[in-house]
Amino acid sequence: EQTIESIATAGYTSILCIVTSPFYSMIGTGAYERKLHSILRAYPDISCEIIKSWWNRPQFFEYWRSQLMAANPLQADTACIFSAHSVPTSTVGSYEDEVMSASNQIAKMVGLNHWYQAWQSAAPYGEWLGPTIESVIEQALIDGAKRIVCIPLGFVSDHVEILYDNDIICRNI
């Protein structure tokens, strides 16, 4: 609210909003969008454009391709696990398809024939999109993986919970 007030005070009449999640979800991006529109009702002179998703941009794919290639993912004993934020199954919409499509495209760019999809940060209540990254790592180890590469493509900025999950919890599995 303070940011919008500052924008109005400075005399701006147009804003462009980009959510740091590359994938649109009703519970994530949609919640920010609803909150913003609610605040903007008090500022009728400000127009707003929201970029709801941007996962399908070439730069997004190229970034993840280069990051993944740096991890040498094609070794026989390596399991590659793509992950994104989990959402309640009742609000999935196109979110799961977008994430799966991005994971598949990046895997093809790198030459992965087999990879896993996982979901992180589900709330402890209700039904959320799964499987969890922990259960996928366990499955990859059962399948013979000696090395795990996590590709958190749903998280494009440092996210304390995901850093903890991937750097501490997942390492101890």
Language model features: what each stretch is:
Residues 1-173:
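Extended amphipathic ligand-handling, pore-lining, and cofactor/metal-binding catalytic surfaces
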